[in-house]
Amino acid sequence: MSILAEKLSSILKRYDELTALLSSAEVINDIKKLTELSKEQSSIEEISVASKEYLSVLENIKENKELLEDKELSELAKEELKILEIKKSELETTIKQLLIPKDPNDDKNIYLELRAGTGGDEAGIFVGDLFKAYCRYADLKKWKVEIVSSSENSVGGYKEIIALIKGKGVYSRLKFEAGTHRVQRVPETESQGRIHTSAITVAIMPEVDDVEISINPSDLKIEVFRAGGHGGQCVNTTDSAVRITHLPTNISVSMQDEKSQHKNKDKALKILKARLYEKQIEEQQLANAKDRKEQVGSGDRSERIRTYNYPQNRLSEHRINLTLYSLEEIMLSGNLDEVINPLIAHAQSQFE
């Protein structure tokens, strides 16, 4: 038996074990264990179906090769073997993809955070432009976008936008967007026609629940204050704004979009959990990177991943040396698959 066949046999064995366990009274009465084993079985269901079919094809190939010795059946066996070899090749391609380790966060919703960096007002304007492109992409994928928090600047741009994006495969498609995005263009306010370079950071944080990350209440510093508007003027006469700081990591989240202090606190806590989970992911990726041939990117906010050059209509994805001369079309249509698909393909190739 080949190494691949042995691996697939072990997967099928585990699938059958899980089927038996999930029907046992002990597991049925243990909600935590039931959920855990159900998730495991679901994660290997697709590869199990393909494995069963592949092993069946191998058995049929073996039987037909034996029939080649039979004069009456040899021609029929030859024809059957041609079909079986094609099927075997197709299944091997499918199985190869299915054996790539699945990111446990791929099916999660995300918090998308865009923040203006260097470049002043122009950086803030690009935060808005890129956010619109993500919203158009979400429409194409039939995802739901909900702005959780936003902070505008004085020229129609944004200092920061945080949005919750819900839908199938959101994290799997957008996780490679994390990092620093650089834009080169002539600002509308530039009378001399000079090209300005500015940058914004993008963070992609999986939405998490209390089971996945727990926070000790004693590790939190919670402050309340009055919400401020443009120019620092007060827009609320009550202390409805909330700032929560996780003392061990010094990660802080402020929220003032809601009139209710309770709602602001709830939103801030959810984003704080997402940021702490994101930190865990980054640390794990750094540890795993030592075992990889190469990484698409760490997801670190400081990593410059992409340049948007408007005068040349050029989008450059630095991690995989991809250059596209259709920047304006991509931004207006939201068809980010032109960039995302090559990034995913590159990431998958690292497991081959």
UniProtKB/Swiss-Prot annotation:
SUPFAM superfamilies: Release factor. InterPro entries: PCRF, Pep_chain_release_fac_I, Pep_chain_release_fac_I_sf, Prokaryotic/Mito_RF, RF-1. It holds the Pfam family PCRF. Methylated by PrmC. Methylation increases the termination efficiency of RF1. GO terms for molecular function: translation release factor activity, codon specific. HAMAP family: Rel_fac_1 (MF_00093). Belongs to the prokaryotic/mitochondrial release factor family. This is Peptide chain release factor 1.
